[in-house]
Swiss-Prot record:
Pfam families recorded: IRF
Disulfide cysteine pairs (residue numbers): none
Known role: Transcriptional regulator which displays a remarkable functional diversity in the regulation of cellular responses. Regulates transcription of IFN and IFN-inducible genes, host response to viral and bacterial infections, regulation of many genes expressed during hematopoiesis, inflammation, immune responses and cell proliferation and differentiation, regulation of the cell cycle and induction of growth arrest and programmed cell death following DNA damage.
A GO cellular-component term linked to this record: cytoplasm
Keyword Acetylation: yes
GO molecular function, one term: DNA binding
Activity control, per UniProt: Activated by MYD88.
Protein name per the record: Interferon regulatory factor 1
Induction cue: Induced by IFN-gamma. Induced by influenza A virus.
Modified how: Phosphorylated by CK2 and this positively regulates its activity. Ubiquitinated in a SPOP-depedent manner. Sumoylation represses the transcriptional activity and displays enhanced resistance to protein degradation. Sumoylated by UBE2I/UBC9 and SUMO1. Inactivates the tumor suppressor activity. Elevated levels in tumor cells. Major site is Lys-276. Sumoylation is enhanced by PIAS3. Desumoylated by SENP1 in tumor cells and appears to compete with ubiquitination on C-terminal sites.
First and last residue of the signal peptide: none
Length: 329
């Protein structure tokens, strides 16, 4: 036969009214507000007979502790008492008045009016629903994707898969598709395709496709040979000038040379190399200026002959009969 014991709320009221536990007192008896000493066991000056007296009395009342049979465990006594207080529906903590730190730590609670039978049933049903939802969430969280895939792979399929398809409706489906699909002749399809191709406009990819490709004509052989003929003609003219030329003696800086007068006229072919004569200046040194000008003119003519020789190179060679003969001074 189970032993009946007093519930926690009336037992707690009896302990407060007895004034046997230090620190357990009413703060406001009309509002049913009271305080419980809640000093931590690690604090200096903590005493098991003074600070853990209420928790030990509750452990003895519930039968979890018997003096002389078990070793004292104030930490477990306090944890069990706190869980019992939080489970009471008609007692709540006044957190703004509680002090959880220091040597004078206390917790303040308020006793609510007793619940009726209907309120107790509603509260009990609500708590049971919450418990069921928590268990469902826990079960869903425990099931991992690996276990789910293993369960799918473990399911075996029958060897005969003919039962998955309904072959009796295959012919009916084909007949329905034939009735719905209109019959199109191949001539109509080909004509529509041809019209569609005719309406298409081909757009060039770039601007180069807008103009026709034009190829320039190849040069004729007569035009290509004109340059060679002109070069040959120039060489012949030069040879004629050398053959018709006459050599004349001249003196420069006391040295005698033969000067080819007609050869100095080659400037008409390659350009005018003659200097413009300056007007005569009436001065006592006029004769000296004229002599210097004549010397520079002769030197220029000699330079033009040497330039022509380097230009012609191997293409035009002087005949062996024409040679520069130095004159004795």
């Amino acid at each position: 036969m189970p032993i009946t014991r007093m519930r926690m709320r009336p037992w707690l009221e009896m302990q407060i009214n007895s004034n046997q536990i230090p620190g357990l007192i009413w703060i406001n008896k009309e509002e049913m507000i009271f305080q419980i000493p809640w000093k931590h066991a690690a604090k200096h000056g903590w005493d098991i007979n003074k600070d853990a007296c209420l928790f030990r009395s509750w452990a003895i009342h519930t039968g979890r502790y018997k003096a002389g049979e078990k070793e004292p465990d104030p930490k477990t006594w306090k944890a069990n008492f706190r869980c019992a207080m939080n489970s009471l529906p008609d007692i709540e903590e006044v957190k703004d008045q509680s002090r959880n730190k220091g040597s004078s730590a206390v917790r303040v609670y308020r006793m609510l009016p007793p619940l009726t039978r209907n309120q107790r049933k509603e509260r009990k049903s609500k708590s049971s629903r919450d418990t069921k939802s928590k268990t469902k969430r826990k079960l869903c969280g425990d099931v991992s994707p690996d276990t789910f895939s293993d369960g799918l792979s473990s399911s075996t399929l029958p060897d005969d898969h003919s039962s998955y398809t309904t072959q009796g409706y295959l012919g009916q489906d084909l007949d329905m598709e034939r009735d719905i699909t209109p019959a199109l002749s191949p001539c109509v399809v080909s004509s529509s395709l041809s019209e569609w191709h005719m309406q298409m406009d081909i757009i060039p990819d770039s601007t180069t496709d807008l103009y026709n490709l034009q190829v320039s004509p190849m040069p004729s052989t007569s035009e290509a040979a004109t340059d060679e003929d002109e070069e040959g003609k120039i060489a012949e003219d030069l040879m004629k000038l050398f053959e018709q030329s006459e050599w004349q003696p001249t003196h420069i800086d006391g040295k005698g040379y033969l000067l080819n007068e007609p050869g100095t006229q080659l400037s008409s072919v390659y350009g005018d190399f003659s200097c413009k004569e300056e007007p005569e200046i009436d001065s006592p040194r006029g004769d000296i200026g004229i002599g210097i000008q004549h010397v520079f003119t002769e030197m220029k003519n000699m330079d033009s002959i040497m330039w022509m020789d380097s230009l012609l190179g191997n293409s035009v060679r002087l005949p062996p009969s024409i040679q520069a003969i130095p004159c004795a001074p």
